[in-house]
Amino acid sequence: RGCNKFCTYCVVPFTRGAEIHRPPDHIVDECKRLADAGVLEITLLGQTVNHYRFEHGASVTVGGVVQPQKGRTYAGGHRRDPFAGEATTTFADLLARIHDEVPSIQRLRFVTSYPRDFGDDVLEVIRDHPRLCRYLHVPAQSGSDRILKLMNRGYTVAEYTEFLDRARAFLDQPEIGRPLMLSGDFIVGFPTETDEDFEATIALVERARYKSAFIFKYSPRPGTVAIEKLADDVPEAVKRSRNNRLLLAQARISEEIGATLLGTTPQVFVEGLSAKERKRRDRAQPASSAPKLPGGVSLTIAGRAASNHAVADTSEEACCSTKPREADADTLPEQVQLSGRTDGDVIVHFDAPPGRSPESMLGTIVPVRITQVRALSVLGTVASA
């Protein structure tokens, strides 16, 4: 947790402090506990997760328990962790260890990565370990070198695109059903951003070919360097126009990338009901008619519950039927639309096949043949085993 980067628009280093790295044994043990509980997919989280590094023997021990340690600040821009060695667990080492020591975890992914410090050692581990997801979230924030410098991002557009090219050379293998999927973050309307700066951002999005991107209008945040030193001088109408234009460009690219999946049959982790299905059920059943999980979903069967974004275990006492009440039987369709993700983080919607209860599919991985494409998702049908 924490961050050492001090981007001028960001408050995280001031609110969460410097990077703190947990002992690798603690992380692996937690993954084992989750696997024993039936979890199939794990995401490692960090503000700059690829900075993870634990130097053995350098931590305080309390009651025989090794404590987390503060991460080093260093120049970065390396191809391999400069502190790698027998006394250090690097991020690449950690990924390989979880993969090898917790074989029942079917998917391991991580977010968010800092692009300048993404070494070949991590790319090699992803390539050589089949249960590591080929999905990288690598925020760019702008396609203008001038704006990147004002943001204190620490890299140029050329350095960022060099990383993308390197990542694709290691990991993009659509011919074996393992394409690399990328996502990014962008801020439009950062102080002093000109039309030329924004056009450079459009060009980067076209060049990067993200499967999705998180796009935001700049707004001053108390406690940041930007609010103290940079006037918020881009008019709101201009921010809104640029935001909408970038969203449209990304939507087109997302749909084009989705089209490359047509006719393929990726493995999909079933997370729960689709948004469309949740809305349909909400219309058909009053909020008071059934117990609700976080996100307003009433689906709890055989010890599993589907929420908005995840699958969670529940006790037998919490189980309830998803069969509609008699008064609603003609309102809800027989088919139930489920939602899940590929290992490349592409959202897939599909109907539970006849003869198979949707509840039994939650938290499983199923093959889905892709038949339709939308800007933010794809649709398909469950393939025969």
Language model features with spans:
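Canonical Radical SAM [4Fe-4S] cluster-binding loop centered on the CxxxCxxC motif
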Residues: 1-25, 58
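N-terminal pre-triad scaffold of radical SAM enzymes
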Residues: 1-8, 32-36, 40-43, 268
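Conserved, mostly hydrophobic/aromatic
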Residues: 7, 27, 44, 110, ...
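Conserved alpha-helical substructure of the radical SAM core
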Residues: 14-43
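Short, ordered loop/turn segments at secondary-structure junctions
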Residues: 15, 47-49, 218, 353
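C-terminal, non-catalytic macromolecule-binding modules
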Residues: 196-246
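Terminal RNA-binding accessory module
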Residues: 226-385
